[in-house]
Amino acid sequence: MYKQGEPNLWTGRLDSETDPKKFRHFQTVTFEDLSKLEKSSMPSGVGILGYAVDKGVALNKGRIGAKEGPDAIKQAFAGLPDLNQCETLVDYGNVYHDHEELIDTQKEFAMLAAKSIANHRQTFLLGGGHDIAYAQYLATRKVYPTQSIGVINIDAHFDTRAEQESTSGTSFRQILEEDDNTDYLVLGIAQGGNTQSLFDYAKEKKIDYVFADELLNHVSPPIKDMIERFVHEHDVIMFTICMDVIDSAFAPGVSAPAVLGLYPHTVLELAKRIIPSDKVSSVSIAEMNPTYDADNRTAKLVANLVHHFLK
């Protein structure tokens, strides 16, 4: 079920009503009905769409609450300064789960997300469970039907479980099983968060991955080269971040908190090798769970990631 954006989420400190250099995002955001959006001749500006769904988390036996994530992130983002002075910043609202099957919600979200991807230079998709990634893939493939897609996931988990239905832990297996013209790179894998069968599947499917331990103090030149080569080798990049990759000291409000997770600045350093490329079709950030957040710490962290990713 699709609902348009809520203007009352977008509030913040007012420093000036006339000087754009003192504006914050709540002063520049606009709201549109994405279901009625027509394709523009030239993509421009930024589109934001929320995936207010945690059904996939429940199916994956995780702790629910991530469906409240998109609104919490938007509220935290609203008060940040508009340093980039975006051409346009549009909040398209959220998609909610009201279908019998999760896959139908994912398809509904994909149809709408594809419109944003086609119309904007940047599209941010805010979760919600990491089943958003499969919906993001469907949207990407709709916009780019023949191009090679490189999927980059900053995550503690492979999310390649073999299940009978779509869950927050199956997205990337679904993508790889359905599409031979995609490849998968995972950054931040937790050795204690994935079974041997998932490592075996990664070997079978030639999934590239980097352990969280390898990213402890810095992003080494070989890892930077790996990321840049992966971007270079594909026509389109689908970029996604699962917030459970970040240590729970910084991101307590997630579905599955990390005890040996990455530092936020490491995630930013990794993203610097990805975001600047014009090949990046969209960015999704998943598993922000306000139910378990402390002082809105995780919501603010996601908001600041989006803020840093604006270009």
Swiss-Prot record:
Keyword set, alphabetical order: Histidine metabolism, Hydrolase, Manganese, Metal-binding
Gene3D superfamilies linked: Ureohydrolase domain
Alphabetical list of Pfam families matching this protein: Arginase
Coiled coil (UniProt feature): none
EC nos: 3.5.3.8
Catalytic activity: N-formimidoyl-L-glutamate + H2O = formamide + L-glutamate
GO terms for MF: agmatinase activity; formimidoylglutamase activity; manganese ion binding
Cofactors that this protein relies on: Mn(2+)
BP terms from Gene Ontology: L-histidine catabolic process to glutamate and formamide; L-histidine catabolic process to glutamate and formate; putrescine biosynthetic process from arginine, via agmatine
Cofactor note: Binds 2 manganese ions per subunit.
Keyword check for Isomerase: no
Residues reported in the UniProt entry to bind Mn(2+) 1: H130, D155, D159, C242
Top-rank taxon: Bacteria
Amino acids binding Mn(2+) 2: D155, H157, C242, D244
Pathway where this protein functions: Amino-acid degradation; L-histidine degradation into L-glutamate; L-glutamate from N-formimidoyl-L-glutamate (hydrolase route): step 1/1
SUPFAM superfamilies in the record: Arginase/deacetylase
Top-tier EC class: hydrolase
Chain's role: Catalyzes the conversion of N-formimidoyl-L-glutamate to L-glutamate and formamide.
Family membership noted in the UniProt record: Belongs to the arginase family.
UniProt protein name: Formimidoylglutamase
Organism (species): Staphylococcus aureus (strain MSSA476)
Upper classification of the organism: Bacteria, Bacillati, Bacillota, Bacilli, Bacillales
Name of the gene encoding the protein in the UniProt record: hutG
